[in-house]
């Protein structure tokens, strides 16, 4: 009985059996460090105290304004890296080969390379849809147009159609939070929204629609103007009106020293 109990506690989990190379060296973080050393890389897995408890299944590697996170597959043996730059996730990859994982991490994090170049060199890397726009420094215009073309965001389209033509507002980076259209001084996350107004369709101002989808469609068919609520810092009410009026309210409440959105995050 005692022998069976000891064998039970010594038995390996399915993950450990699937990744013997990780089991051998004590987890994913150690294995990645070993691979990076093989390539004479300057990189090391981030020594974050919060990650100490998950050394086997997760790792984060940073260099300047770039970083990658690595996960592992639970049902199939796969190393799953992502590729971040200046607060934006630009690509994902999957490989069964930990040596390839070390190579792609070193190449991405230690070189001034585009996402396109990364994918051309490593066929297992798939750029995100927005990656090309960020590579070509066109992310602000791209994101404005993406919101305008997003059918799930029709409730803010009346406002976006005029805001996208405004030379001040269209130089900020737009993003949505629930039903609210927000603006940022930077193009990466976390965003810099301090003291910048945002706009919410009035029917969604309390985070719950007061109209059904059917009645919302009927509103468009009857050409009823959508009303927008403009706020700042989440709780300061600035005004309410149609799209044109909301734009005027926003511009009256923009900081005097406002500049076009920069690459990077609120932290840098």
What are these regions (language model features)?
Residues 64-104, 177-241:
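Intrinsically disordered, low-complexity regulatory segments enriched in Ser/Thr/Pro
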Residues 1-14, 163, 202-227, 265-268:
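Polar low-complexity intrinsically disordered regions
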Residues 90-121, 223-268:
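Ampiphathic alpha-helical segments that act as solvent-exposed interaction surfaces
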């Amino acid at each position: 009985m005692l022998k069976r109990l000891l064998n039970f506690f010594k038995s390996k989990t399915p993950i450990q059996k699937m990744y013997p190379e990780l089991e051998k060296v004590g987890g994913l973080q150690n294995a990645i460090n070993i691979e990076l050393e093989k390539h004479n890389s300057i990189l090391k897995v981030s020594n974050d105290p919060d990650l100490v408890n998950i050394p086997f299944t997760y790792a984060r590697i940073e260099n300047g304004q770039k970083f990658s996170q690595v996960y592992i597959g639970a049902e199939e043996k796969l190393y799953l890296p992502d590729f971040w730059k200046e607060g934006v996730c630009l690509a994902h990859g999957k490989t069964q080969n930990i040596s390839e994982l070390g190579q792609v991490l070193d190449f991405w994090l230690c070189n001034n390379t585009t996402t396109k170049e990364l994918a051309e060199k490593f066929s297992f890397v798939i750029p995100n849809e927005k990656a090309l726009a960020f590579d070509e420094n066109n992310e602000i215009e791209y994101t404005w147009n993406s919101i305008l073309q997003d059918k799930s965001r029709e409730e803010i389209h009346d406002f976006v159609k005029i805001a996208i033509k405004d030379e001040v507002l269209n130089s900020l980076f737009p993003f949505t939070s629930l039903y609210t259209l927000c603006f940022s001084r930077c193009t990466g996350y976390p965003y810099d929204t301090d003291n910048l107004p945002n706009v919410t369709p009035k029917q969604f101002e309390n985070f719950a629609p007061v109209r059904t989808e059917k009645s919302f469609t009927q509103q468009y068919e009857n050409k009823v103007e959508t009303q927008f609520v403009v706020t700042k810092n989440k709780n300061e009410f600035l005004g309410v009106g149609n799209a044109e009026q909301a734009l005027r309210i926003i511009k009256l409440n923009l900081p005097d020293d406002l500049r076009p959105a920069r690459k990077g995050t609120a932290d840098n």
